């Protein structure tokens, strides 16, 4: 009996099942920029608009809305916010309601709020002036830092030295002229002596 080798059992290895790639939800480009920027706070815009008005009786709600719209605030969408802000500001004492009731009527700044706005404007203007002065000084400083070559003035002869020189020259001229005068006087005196002698001789001859 020939022994037959057992046939190698063919073992089938199951292929690895690939899991479907799960897509991660990433932020879409432009999502961060798509968010609307925060609008201006109405509680700050209303006092600023009222401070610009020069009406003693206050500003009406319609005029206030026009001023807010001119400042870039969306009045139509935020109508309810404007009314709530007006009520809050009146309760806090920032605004005074001169006409009407509730959110309708006319409003103006209280004396305390008006004085605070004036002080803030004064501080801002003073700081702006200080900055301008600092810039102007800084711009002028490089020019002044340049060393200027100072030319030495020529020594001008003083009047005293000139007068001294003139007096010295005059004295020298007088000294030079004086010998000639002395000679002239000597010659004149000699001539006069000769004349006197001649006259004496003539007188003596006449007497003889």
From Swiss-Prot:
The modification Phosphothreonine is found at residue 156. GO terms for cellular component: condensed nuclear chromosome; nucleosome; nucleus. The modification Citrulline is found at residue 56. Residues 38-111 form the H15 domain. The modification Phosphoserine is found at residues 9, 141, 163, 178, 187. It is found in: Nucleus; Chromosome. GO terms for molecular function: DNA binding; double-stranded DNA binding; nucleosomal DNA binding; structural constituent of chromatin. It holds the Pfam family Linker_histone. Residues 199-208 have a biased composition (Basic and acidic residues). Residues 1-39, 93-208 are annotated as: Disordered. Belongs to the histone H1/H5 family. The Gln-54 residue in the globular domain forms a hydrogen bond with the main chain carbonyl of Met-52 and is spatially oriented away from the nucleosome dyad axis, leading to lower affinity towards Four-way junction DNA and reconstituted 5S mononucleosomes. This is Histone H1t.
């Amino acid at each position: 009996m020939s022994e037959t080798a057992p046939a190698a059992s063919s073992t089938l290895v199951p292929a690895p099942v690939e899991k479907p790639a799960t897509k991660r939800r990433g932020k879409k480009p432009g999502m961060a920029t798509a968010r609307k920027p925060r609008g201006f706070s109405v509680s700050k815009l209303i006092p600023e608009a009222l401070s610009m008005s020069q009406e003693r009786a206050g500003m009406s709600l319609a005029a206030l809305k026009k001023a807010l719209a001119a400042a870039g605030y969306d009045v139509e969408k935020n109508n309810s916010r404007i009314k709530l802000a007006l009520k809050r500001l009146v309760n806090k004492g920032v605004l005074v309601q001169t006409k009407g009731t509730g959110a309708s009527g006319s409003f103006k700044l209280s004396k305390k709020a008006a004085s605070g706005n004036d002080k803030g404007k004064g501080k801002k203007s003073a700081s702006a002036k200080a900055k301008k002065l600092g810039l102007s000084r800084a711009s002028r400083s490089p020019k002044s830092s340049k060393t200027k070559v100072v030319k030495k003035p020529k020594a001008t002869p003083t009047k005293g030295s000139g007068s001294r020189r003139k007096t010295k020259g005059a004295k020298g001229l007088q000294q030079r002229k004086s010998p000639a005068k002395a000679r002239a006087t000597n010659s004149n005196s000699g001539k006069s002596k000769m004349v006197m002698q001649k006259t004496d001789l003539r007188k003596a001859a006449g007497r003889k």
